[in-house]
Curated annotation (Swiss-Prot):
Source taxon at top rank: Eukaryota
Location(s) in or outside the cell: Nucleus
Gene name of this polypeptide: BOI
Role summary: E3 ubiquitin-protein ligase involved in the regulation of pathogen and abiotic stress responses by facilitating degradation of MYB108/BOI. Attenuates cell death by preventing caspase activation. Has no effect on the stability of the DELLA proteins. Not regulated by MYB108/BOI.
Induction remark: Up-regulated by pathogen, methyl violagen, salicylic acid, 1-aminocyclopropane-1-carboxylic acid (ACC) and salt. Down-regulated by methyl jasmonate and gibberellic acid.
UniProt KW keywords: Apoptosis, Coiled coil, Metal-binding, Nucleus, Plant defense, Transferase, Ubl conjugation pathway, Zinc, Zinc-finger
UniProt pathway annotation: Protein degradation; proteasomal ubiquitin-dependent pathway
Notes on the domains: The N-terminal domain (1-150) prevents cell death by suppressing caspase-like protease activation. The WRD domain (178-214) is necessary for interaction with MYB108/BOS1.
A single MF term (Gene Ontology): ubiquitin-protein transferase activity
The name this protein goes by in its record: E3 ubiquitin-protein ligase BOI
Pfam annotation, one family: zf-C3HC4_3
Coiled-coil segments on the chain, per record: 197-220
Keyword tRNA processing: no
Tissue: Expressed in leaves, siliques, roots, flowering tissues and stigma tips.
């Protein structure tokens, strides 16, 4: 059957702006064409003959675009001559092509649905890829920030620990110094305690001796009584018979300077022979009466 056409490329109007929307498949087993796409366009142009089972259409999608391979069987010269001078204003004859689907509208719906599903799947895949990439970047940033934060916290903690260690060492040294000071103070306290106990014992002894001297002085009838022998001592070695301990009052004045009244008792000979000034002198070592070495002296209040 001959169809008048004005264009040699009979499939020029089959090419859609969206190349993924048009797909021709050839069913070689049934000898039919399966078309999945939009509405079937009108074929116009120069006259040529198309056999239903002779035409082959292969549309393959490549990376660079769409490539078409269409083979048209040779037309007979007679048929071309018959239709070469046909009236150009004559109505265009259409040829129906056998399709597997029932109607073009269903094909359009299925094609649109398939395109939408494909686009939706591509969008979902793209969104999933971008989401995964963004998640990886966020995780990497979080890990980097976490490491930086951990490093900063570790540095601060290490600095604080070093300061605490230094403070512990300083306090430990100070504690050792204080312990040594406490030990020295304890030893010094013991020494002073011993000295205090010794001085207290000496004071008690001197107080007892003073009480005895004062008691003996009260037994004399008058303070002007003198002993005939100035060299006589009250020591036990000087008293041959009785061995009693008596105080010997030598004259009324000081045996060293002779100017003031004798008010200092010399021990251990117990001669009341020195005044207050001579008794407090550090140069006097012996008793001026008996020349006995002095080990102590007692001031006696002679006022009544």
């Amino acid at each position: 059957m001959a169809v008048q056409a004005h264009h040699m490329n009979i499939f020029s109007q089959f090419i859609s702006p969206n190349r993924d929307c048009v797909k021709f498949q050839e069913n070689m087993n049934h000898g039919e064409f399966e078309f999945t796409g939009g509405e079937v366009p009108l074929i116009t142009g120069e006259s040529f003959a198309v056999e239903p089972l002779a035409a082959k259409a292969n549309f393959n999608k490549a990376e660079s675009g769409l490539s078409y391979n269409f083979t048209v069987p040779p037309l007979s010269t007679k048929r071309q001559r018959d239709f070469q001078f046909s009236d150009s204003n004559a109505p265009v004859k259409r040829r129906s092509v056998a399709f597997d689907s029932s109607s073009p509208s269903l094909i359009n719906v299925e094609l649109v649905s398939q395109i939408q599903n494909q686009q939706q799947s591509e969008i979902d895949r793209f969104v999933a890829q971008q989401t995964e990439k963004l998640r990886i970047e966020i995780e990497a940033r979080q890990q980097t920030q976490t490491r930086m934060l951990a490093s900063a916290v570790q540095n601060v903690i290490a600095k604080k620990l070093k300061e605490k260690d230094d403070e512990i060492v300083r306090i430990r040294n100070l504690n050792w110094v204080l312990q040594e000071r406490v030990k020295s103070l304890y030893v010094e306290n013991q020494i002073w305690r011993d000295i205090a106990q010794t001085n207290e014992a000496n004071a008690n002894t001197l107080r007892t001796n003073l009480d005895q001297v004062l008691a003996q002085l009260e037994t004399f009838p008058t303070a002007s009584a003198v002993v005939e022998d100035d060299a006589e001592s009250s020591c036990g070695s000087c008293c041959g018979d009785g061995g009693g301990e008596a105080v010997t009052a030598v004259g009324g004045g000081c045996k060293r300077c002779g100017e003031r009244e004798a008010s200092v008792l010399v021990l251990p000979c117990r001669h009341l022979c020195l005044c207050t000034v001579c008794g407090g002198s550090a140069l006097l070592r012996t008793c001026p009466v008996c020349d006995m070495v002095m080990n102590a002296s007692v001031h006696v209040n002679m006022s009544s």
